[in-house]
């Protein structure tokens, strides 16, 4: 299964090299989950953690019954053309930048900005606002599926420090530790 959203530093293209190296394990733990390409590929019990509140909100919405509302909210995007997608992108970016409390709207907006931003970038200005422009896509694409809902509904999803997650892991866990590259 592919990740729900594009994510900088994602491991989808490296899976053919990573998967053969994975040991036997009970649960995949990703302290720096990001797009969680490795965990979604394995389709096993997982613990996803990140400090990105929008990303963790998305995973929590998908894990819950709100998943069905989210699917309904993004469905119209698949038939939109460039100009409508551009409008949706900037509206979604405003939602992300204004601390939305509606979990489904926030999750939809995060999917929109991740899938339609320029070059898949995630960048914030000095005020903490997401400031990547629209990527001029002609069509919307997203891999959100019932499989993601089923997998995440049994997963542990946390917004915590990676150190806490590593310290709280137990025997049988496999920790896939791929920290972000902050100084590039």
Cite the ranges covered by each PLM segment.
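SAM-dependent nucleic-acid methyltransferase catalytic core
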Residues: 1-13, 21, 66-184
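Conserved S-adenosyl-L-methionine
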Residues: 10, 21-80
């Amino acid at each position: 299964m592919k990740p729900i959203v594009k994510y900088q530093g994602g491991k989808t293209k490296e899976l053919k090299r990573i998967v053969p190296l994975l040991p036997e394990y009970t649960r995949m733990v990703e302290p720096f989950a990001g797009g969680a390409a490795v965990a979604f590929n394995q389709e096993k019990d997982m613990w996803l953690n990140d400090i990105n509140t929008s990303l963790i909100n998305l995973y929590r919405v998908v894990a819950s019954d709100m998943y069905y509302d989210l699917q309904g909210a993004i469905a119209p995007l698949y038939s939109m053309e460039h100009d409508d997608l551009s409008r949706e992108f900037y509206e979604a970016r405003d939602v992300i930048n204004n601390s939305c409390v509606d979990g489904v709207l926030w999750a939809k907006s995060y999917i929109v900005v991740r899938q339609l931003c320029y070059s898949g970038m995630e960048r914030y200005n000095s005020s903490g606002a997401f400031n990547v422009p629209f990527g001029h896509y002609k069509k919307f694409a997203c891999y959100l599926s019932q499989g993601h809902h089923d997998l995440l509904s049994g997963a542990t999803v946390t917004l915590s420090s990676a150190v806490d997650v590593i310290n709280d892991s137990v025997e049988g866990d496999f920790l896939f530790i791929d920290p972000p590259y902050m100084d590039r």
